[in-house]
């Protein structure tokens, strides 16, 4: 077998392989951009930056207050667009104006705001959704030199599919791709 303690990383090919599984309904990459300084005109703040795929809105829905969520075209064309959380909007646009179509600076890059969201409950991948800016996952990978690696995947199976079977299909696919024993519960973790 393989040596114990060997490390491996999820990547975009894993996402594409799992997307093809018949039990999977929605799947999203999750790429952490960490805390970043952001600004709009004279208004500044430090907020969480997350990279998601458009399916994330189906997996962990947010209420869309203005504009829209990320879509497939944003991802395919790697558009520099973002969806901002409610508190980000309040801090960077204190006048309360509609920010859609306006630009915010994230580090040295500029992004066009396409939507404002607030949580419908539940959590969003280890960040406070109201203080988070979401951009296409591929852009987080590019901006921070992550190559094709993905921090996590979020996915849902079809409603009539037993959860354990969805997990088993995913585990087998990833284990085969990364030469991991299919029964290694520590190497591939589901929650």
Positions of the model-derived regions?
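Structured loop/turn residues at beta-strand edges in well-structured enzyme cores
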Residues: 22-25, 148, 186
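Short loop/turn motifs enriched for small/polar and acidic residues
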Residues: 32, 116, 191
